[in-house]
């Protein structure tokens, strides 16, 4: 009986081998097609090395950014892994380490002699500040261990997440956030648009505020002081100057820390919708809270600044009475701590309009306001509901005085786009 089935089985195996061989030749041919990969890489700079056309750029002499080193069918439009390995071995034999920022895909570290580190976070989003710290310390340690060492950093497309972490390292080395973002944009793209997602740029600014250089810039690594976890209570979400809609849905999430795991998944806390309120409606169930510093005389009759909690009701200017605003007032304030993500949708499930990420430790005066340029991935549908004065406003309850008081000088010196 076995002899009767041997020929069909052999024919099937032979066909499988032939198909795999054909697939390999097809991938090899298409991976050499400059057109396909140039189309996918868009405005990212490419390198032509040893006949290979690769999506990679030197940001500095020791930091290289690139797209994902792919295998199989994905190699048709990403960097083929074997070509990346060949170029790195040729240029930096024994002196390169790969940093993979993808959570969605990985590869066998043995392809790169085991020198692969993983710092995964979600595409088009931000990592926790603790991960940025570990990443910068790891890169610094590797580069300082030998003058020829380089760090090769990639996500999937090799632009947003890669840019955030490259810029974070440049800031760690003493550059300002603005200079780091500008350098990355110039070296990585042809249109000078490097890290284009506002929340990712915001986190580069957050990271800069965690660093100090007591020995001076370029005299050793900086001191890193991450903010203590700061609990804030979200009381109201308001969308100013909306058009063509009577309600917008939202989802609020936090990055959840998991023991012994570097990746922090987003955990949904609540979902609801902002609705249009009637003009003249008194929203006294959700006042604004502010910390006001006023002069108070002590026993020595010398004026001192003392923080006082001030409750201010809604007092929009008259121009806003003619605008449509969408509100959601929390019956019970929503506690938030650390890294927060808020996404807005046209429908309860699906139809994303835009989103924003922020850290609660960097909120000033219990108020966070983001205009259209400060929001992430605003598409055609998102823009269609935003008027010229559109603004997202999040109102929080009193801050934890121990960790998040901002003095008047703090408020004056902090830039709006890093809020």
How would you name each of these model-derived features?
Residues 2, 35, 52, 160-163:
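Glycine-centered flexibility motif
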Residues 146-168:
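A phosphate-binding catalytic loop at a beta-strand-loop-alpha-helix junction
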Residues 161-168, 175, 179-180, 196-199:
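Long all-alpha helical scaffold domains
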